[in-house]
Curated annotation (Swiss-Prot):
Signal transducer and activator of transcription that mediates signaling by type I interferons (IFN-alpha and IFN-beta). Following type I IFN binding to cell surface receptors, Jak kinases (TYK2 and JAK1) are activated, leading to tyrosine phosphorylation of STAT1 and STAT2. The phosphorylated STATs dimerize, associate with IRF9/ISGF3G to form a complex termed ISGF3 transcription factor, that enters the nucleus. ISGF3 binds to the IFN stimulated response element (ISRE) to activate the transcription of interferon stimulated genes, which drive the cell in an antiviral state. The modification Phosphothreonine is found at T294, T800. Gene3D superfamilies: EF-hand, SH2 domain, STAT transcription factor, all-alpha domain, STAT transcription factor, DNA-binding domain, STAT transcription factor, N-terminal domain. GO terms for molecular function: DNA-binding transcription factor activity; DNA-binding transcription factor activity, RNA polymerase II-specific; identical protein binding; RNA polymerase II cis-regulatory region sequence-specific DNA binding; ubiquitin-like protein ligase binding. The modification Phosphoserine is found at S283, S287, S753. It comes from Homo sapiens. It is found in: Cytoplasm; Nucleus. This is Signal transducer and activator of transcription 2.
Amino acid sequence: MAQWEMLQNLDSPFQDQLHQLYSHSLLPVDIRQYLAVWIEDQNWQEAALGSDDSKATMLFFHFLDQLNYECGRCSQDPESLLLQHNLRKFCRDIQPFSQDPTQLAEMIFNLLLEEKRILIQAQRAQLEQGEPVLETPVESQQHEIESRILDLRAMMEKLVKSISQLKDQQDVFCFRYKIQAKGKTPSLDPHQTKEQKILQETLNELDKRRKEVLDASKALLGRLTTLIELLLPKLEEWKAQQQKACIRAPIDHGLEQLETWFTAGAKLLFHLRQLLKELKGLSCLVSYQDDPLTKGVDLRNAQVTELLQRLLHRAFVVETQPCMPQTPHRPLILKTGSKFTVRTRLLVRLQEGNESLTVEVSIDRNPPQLQGFRKFNILTSNQKTLTPEKGQSQGLIWDFGYLTLVEQRSGGSGKGSNKGPLGVTEELHIISFTVKYTYQGLKQELKTDTLPVVIISNMNQLSIAWASVLWFNLLSPNLQNQQFFSNPPKAPWSLLGPALSWQFSSYVGRGLNSDQLSMLRNKLFGQNCRTEDPLLSWADFTKRESPPGKLPFWTWLDKILELVHDHLKDLWNDGRIMGFVSRSQERRLLKKTMSGTFLLRFSESSEGGITCSWVEHQDDDKVLIYSVQPYTKEVLQSLPLTEIIRHYQLLTEENIPENPLRFLYPRIPRDEAFGCYYQEKVNLQERRKYLKHRLIVVSNRQVDELQQPLELKPEPELESLELELGLVPEPELSLDLEPLLKAGLDLGPELESVLESTLEPVIEPTLCMVSQTVPEPDQGPVSQPVPEPDLPCDLRHLNTEPMEIFRNCVKIEEIMPNGDPLLAGQNTVDEVYVSRPSHFYTDGPLMPSDF
């Protein structure tokens, strides 16, 4: 819906404002309405505010041409007499602006601004009243373009009809001219004079029709130019969206609609080009002095050809940027020797029936003159041919699926070396495509380029290479600037923050909220930063160590992203992981909650680690906050985080293990928060011969710690410490996660059901791993073994002979009763049922976090 059409649908108060606006305007309302689409399509802002007066002058004369054309159309309709009069009057009224066309541009530009202001006021009023909002011009552009295409097709049909009538008129003239030439009689012959008069009238009518056809072709070309001016910005929008999508922005960037529009526009231009050729032929058959077709057709044809070439050149695009199949989430990174894919497309879907189109690919057509800049060759075939049959069925699409790059050797032997000012991951390379396009006699070489790619030689460089891709596509205004990292610009947080969130939303499904982004902002710029939109340098993003973990910021963040994707995706997407929380914020959150409240946050001191912190309130009103040593992917590969949380044990003062993790922040019971992620629960009614084994995590609490808990500093002192020294790693519980298996306690049917619910033995950890198949028990009488003297009295009747094989690695005397020993979700087919494994002891005391 055009802006003027939306204004007509406004309520009375806003309609009154519109009438008042045009009551003092030189532009009449009826002309504003009749030329609404054309007026709104022109760039009045550039003409009014630009420093180049030529744009205002050109727009002024285009306006006059449009008025004259519309006036000519109205002259054929008797009912449009009033409109025709107003068009002519306005055309005369604006003649004085020929001396200063900028004034006319300013007048219309200000009118459009006032219209938009009235429209915005009306939309706000509708929002306050709860009414549906009017459709904005941006949302209606698709309808606008399609409507224009329909109008152009109608104009084209009319032009075809006019040319047909012109041919008939020219045939009449030729016939009369030949008759006149044959019957040569004295000039005083009345009949001859009459014939000459008729011939002259026929020539005058022919000249008139030629001018009308030429004017119609000019008007059609003007409308086509406007259509192309609408389509090309749409294509630029798509390219900008594609660039952002390459760095994982959530944007839909399909090309099907653009292909339909570009093809329709090209068809109209090619058709007009053919009609101009017909007019040229008519001019060659019959030519006379001041023939409008003699120069007019050549001029129109040149304009059409130029517009077609411009459209075709822009219509050849890279639809899918280069990407390796093994890293689909990180395009624009290529590895030497590895295959990658890329797709090009011509949006003008017109191909000769007998012409195949071949695209050639090359790399670094115009490489930068930098010392040490690497050079590459395309190892596989650098051509792709599209037959007419495939082009008609799938479109003009060239899929390169097996391209491979190899580095050129420098000197006589060995690989090329990179000793220039740029690192390997800062070199930018451009892959180019060329196709020789031919259609209806028009031949043109079309070229297009990919976005700059980073070429690595080892997958260990993938992370920092992605940082380069992210930085370039976020900040570079020039997509061909291969020397971007010679002097990389700083990134404003307003751009960088959303881009970091895109990495999570695209790769794991959920982006970063405002609190998480705020933590990252403080980590990069400090809590004292008061700048509204601070700037971050490339070195600070990827190279400079970031306290407290002594890791570059991007390395730290990318390792977390990898950890979440591989092991924590469901927990992250469901909001169970708070994640990016500073230690000071962690303390502020937990100290106000009940004992046992915990949260999950990413460690700031390890590469890809997640830790669990919980609060304990002492009897003397002291608050202690503990953090477990971070779990990395090596740990989580053996035991899911949800199972660690479920079965985590902390030894109390009486040396009895208990789980201190009771409520997920703010107050969600642990099993309610994580129950849906637990492994399959065990049927407690099932009778088993052996106790299942499972991995659990247990931390020791030292006696002196229990007797003398550390007192947390008051909040002001804490904040002062942060401002002066920065955050330092908190004391954490060191965990050695090691699965310990115990096999084959033959308890007998009498004691088994009792011990399943009461016995949970704990043994001293050891690196020894034993797996022993235990035979089925004999169904005959069982002799009573002599009990071990160190066993508890309630276990001395057990047969411990089959357990001798564990004597070197298991201390039976440390087995302790502690609840149900069965771990849910175990496979009962091929595992050895053993007693519950021991805790994983810590290599240091459990200390409260300083923050």
